[in-house]
Amino acid sequence: MKRSVHSRNWKDVVNKYCLLLLVFILSSCSKDEETPLPEQPGSGVSSFNFTALKVNDVFNGYSYYGLNDKPVFKVSFSNPIDRTSVPVSVKLSDATGQAIPVSISYLQGDSTLSATPITALKPLGKYFFDVQTNIKSTAGKYLSAPITVNFITALDPGDKFPRLSDEQLLDLVQKQTFKYFWDFGHPVSGMARERNTAGNTVTTGGTGFGVMAIVTAVNRDFITRQQGAARVRQIVDFLKKADRYHGAFSHWMDGNSGETIPFSLKDNGGDLVETALLMQGLLTAKQYFNAENATEKSIAKDIQALYESVEWDWYTKNGNSLFWHWSPEYQWDMNLPIKGWNEALITYVLAAASPMHSISKSVYDQGWAGNGAIRNGNTYFNQVLPLGSSSGGPLFFAQYSFLGLNPNGLKDAYADYGTQVKSHALIQYEYAKANPKAYYGYGENCWGLTASDDINGYLTHEINNDNGVVSPTAALSSFPYTPAESMKALRFFYYQLGDKIWGKYGFTDAFSLHHAWFADSTLAIDQGPMIIMIENYRSQLLWKLFMSNQEVKTGLRKLGFSSPNI
C-alpha cells in the first residue's frame, strides 16, 4: 500500500512539471506568431497603391499607339516614394526585353514620379513601361500591384526614297512587281509560284494573273515580245501535260511534274474558279499574241484547246449551279456551289462563253444570282452597294473577275458593275477615314482590306473582320475605280512605309501600323492584280484585250449583260 501511495505522489510531481513545460512551449509559440515577418513586395500587407497614370499627360488605358519618340510617363501613388527603390523597380524595355535608360524626376512631394527615355526611341517600335512591386514608399511599404504600359511609337513621316513623278512611280511599281512573275517564275513550268517561299508549289489562278502581267510587261517594254511569247509558250506546254479533271486544273500543282498538290484534304482535284482565273489570263494572252508567226499562232491554238477542254457544264452536276470542286477520290464531297457575290463572276461568264461546254442562263440566274438574292442595295458610308454582303466583303471580290472584264458600263438584271466595284472601294476608303475601331495609321492615305497574310497566319480582312491589318494590293488594285484615293495610298506606302514594305518584288503582302507588324511575304494572287489594274487604269490594255474576245462577248450577251464593249 505504501508503495502505491509513493508512486502516486511521484506521478503528481511529474504531471505538474509536464504541465508547466507545456505552458512554456505554448507561450513561446504564441510570441513567435506575434513577431512581424519581413514584408514581401506586392503581398498586400502594409502596402501602398498607385492612384493615377498619365502618358504624355493623358490617360487612355494601358496600351498606346503612335507615341512620340520621348514619351513622358507620370505615375502617382498613395504615399511618397523611397527614391532608392526606383532604379530597380521602374523599367522601360523594347520588345526583346532590352532595357532602355530613363530619366526620373519627382513631383508632389515624391508621391508622383515622371519617367522619360534618355535617348529617342525608334519609330514604329514596340515598348513596355513597368513599375514593379518592389518599389517602396518612404514608410517602407511595397506597391500592392505592378503597373505595365505597352506602347508603339509613331511612324517616321519623312520620305524613305527620293520623290518621283506619279507616272514614274507607277512605272516603278509595275516593273518591280513584275519581277515576282518573271525572275521568280518556276524554272521548269514558267508558272507563278504560290508565294515567295513556295518552292515547287505553283498556283493556277495566280498564273493567270502572271500571264496578264507578262502581256503588260511586253507592252511597257520591260521585256521583249519574243521573251513574253516564249514564257507563255512554256506555261502552255506545261499545262497541256498537267493533271486535269474534266478539263479543270487543281488549285496548286507541282511546278516540275504538273501533278496536283492538295489545297486541303478533299480539295485534291479540279478547282473551277482557279481554272477560270487561269483562263481569263490565257484568253487575254491569246488576244495579244496574235502575230502571223509560228510561235504566236501555236500559242493561240493551244490556249483555245485548253479553254475548250474545260467541261464547265459537267461541273453543274446536272443542276442549276456550278460547283467549285471535284475530286476523283472524294467526288463532290466538298459540295461548294459557286454563288454570288464574290470573286467568281468570271467563272459563269467563261462557262457561258464556252463553245464546247456552255451553261444556260438559268444556271447563272439560279446558281450565281440566287434569282435576285445576290442584291444588296444598302448604303454604307454614303455609298450604295448594289450586290453582296454587308459593306461588300474583302476587296478582291471587286478585282479578280475584273482584271479582264471591264465593269464600266457593264450591266445586267442585278447590277451596274461599274457602280458595284467603285462603291465597294469607296466604302473601304471612307471606312478607313472614319476609323471606327481607332486603329493607328488608318486614314485617307492608308486603307484597303482584303485576304492576305496576317499577324497570325492568313486572314480574309474586311470591314466586318478587321484587325488592323492593311494589304497594299487592296487599294492599289482599285486604281481604275478610285484613282485619286489609290494614288494617295501608293504615295504613302512607297514614300512613308517603303523602308518597311518595299522589296525586290514590289510591296510585301500586308502590314499593321497599329501592331507594328510587317509581312515579308509576297503572293502571286496579290502581286498580279496590282500590275494588271494599274495598267487598266493607265491604258485599259487588259480590259480591251479580254473584252475583244468574241466568245467572251457571246457569253456575256447570253447571260443577259449589256456593255458598250460587247
Predicted stretch roles:
Residues 15-20:
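Sec-dependent signal peptide recognition
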Residues 14, 38-41, 108-111, 208-219:
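Structured core of small recognition/catalytic domains
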Residues 25-28:
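C-terminal motif of bacterial Sec signal peptides marking the signal peptidase cleavage site
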Residues 33-158:
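Acidic, low-complexity Ser/Thr/Gly/Pro-rich repeat segments typical of extracellular/periplasmic
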Residues 1-13:
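N-terminal secretory signal peptides that target proteins for export/translocation
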Residues 156-566:
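Ser/Thr/Asn(+Pro)-rich, low-complexity disordered segments
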